[in-house]
């Protein structure tokens, strides 16, 4: 078991004073079978009115609004989370069971294409080949490895609005793209797949008490009789280094910050993630 502290700070600077802004932050880690949230707080400068709710996908959302003129806005989420090294084992399912109407009806929302995970004949052909040679759980790993083989990890080559196919055409991308491309393959095979946002401590041999530059990260969940997590970017099942925050169909459902404001565009955006292993 690991205990980690994560501080995620996002700062905006506006061209001219924004007279009002309305925002949602998905920055609170989840409590589930492999991780426990000890504490979390989301704070803003300037101070705002806020409230929390759980969205459709089970992600904690902090909604806040600021109705006074402001030229800067900083949102900081501070969390302490305990994580386990291994997830509980899940039952296996056959291709025949995956193709049953009961499964298709139950998981329809995470089987359908989205703007980030569109249908593509080339990718579908890859999925068909993988499904022919692997049982479902191993097919998930094969799909992730295929996506990884097609993309070079190069930050800055894609943006938050890029789809998995955009990254495939460029042959490069970041963790968001690796996850989206993997989901395209999974859904083409009829395997329910979800996008996960969170954090990754970069050091497997992390020193207790040492603060390091962390990473916002993305990976996938697949359902093969039960949900389990796999990281296509690093080609591993997730470990205690991973902290999950949001789950959804794609990036749209888990964007860390989204909102609207009245005023001219932001001239600067600064994001800092710091992670400390506490135990």
UniProtKB/Swiss-Prot annotation:
Matches recorded under InterPro entries: Bac_transglu_N, Papain-like_cys_pep_sf, Transglutaminase-like
SUPFAM superfamilies membership: Cysteine proteinases
Coiled coil: none
Gene3D superfamilies (alphabetical): 3.10.620.30
Record family assignment: To M.tuberculosis Rv2569c.
Name this protein carries in UniProt: Uncharacterized protein ML0607
Source organism: Mycobacterium leprae (strain TN)
């Amino acid at each position: 078991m690991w205990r980690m502290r994560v501080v995620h700070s996002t700062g905006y600077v506006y061209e001219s004073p924004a007279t009002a802004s309305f925002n949602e932050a998905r920055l609170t880690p989840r409590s589930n079978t492999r991780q426990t949230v000890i504490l979390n707080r989301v704070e803003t400068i300037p101070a705002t009115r806020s409230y929390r709710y759980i969205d459709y996908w089970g992600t904690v959302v902090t909604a806040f609004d600021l109705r006074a003129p402001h030229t800067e806005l900083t949102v900081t989420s501070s969390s302490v989370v305990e994580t386990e090294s291994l997830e509980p084992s899940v039952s296996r399912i056959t291709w025949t069971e995956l193709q049953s109407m009961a499964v298709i009806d139950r998981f329809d929302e995470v089987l359908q294409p989205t703007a980030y995970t569109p249908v593509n004949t080339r990718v579908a052909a890859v999925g068909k080949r993988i499904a022919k040679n692997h049982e479902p759980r191993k097919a998930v790993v094969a799909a992730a490895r295929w996506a990884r083989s097609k993309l070079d990890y190069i930050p800055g080559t894609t943006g938050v609005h890029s789809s998995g196919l955009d990254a495939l055409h460029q042959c490069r991308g970041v963790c968001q793209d690796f996850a989206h491309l993997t989901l395209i393959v999974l859904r083409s095979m009829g395997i329910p797949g979800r996008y996960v946002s969170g954090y990754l401590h970069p050091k497997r041999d992390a020193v207790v008490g040492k603060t390091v530059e962390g990473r916002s990260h993305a990976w996938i969940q697949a359902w093969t009789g039960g949900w389990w997590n796999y990281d296509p970017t690093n080609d591993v099942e997730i470990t205690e280094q991973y902290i999950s925050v949001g789950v959804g169909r794609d990036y749209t459902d888990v964007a860390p910050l989204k909102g609207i404001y009245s005023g001219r565009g932001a001239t600067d955006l600064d994001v800092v993630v710091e992670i400390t292993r506490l135990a």
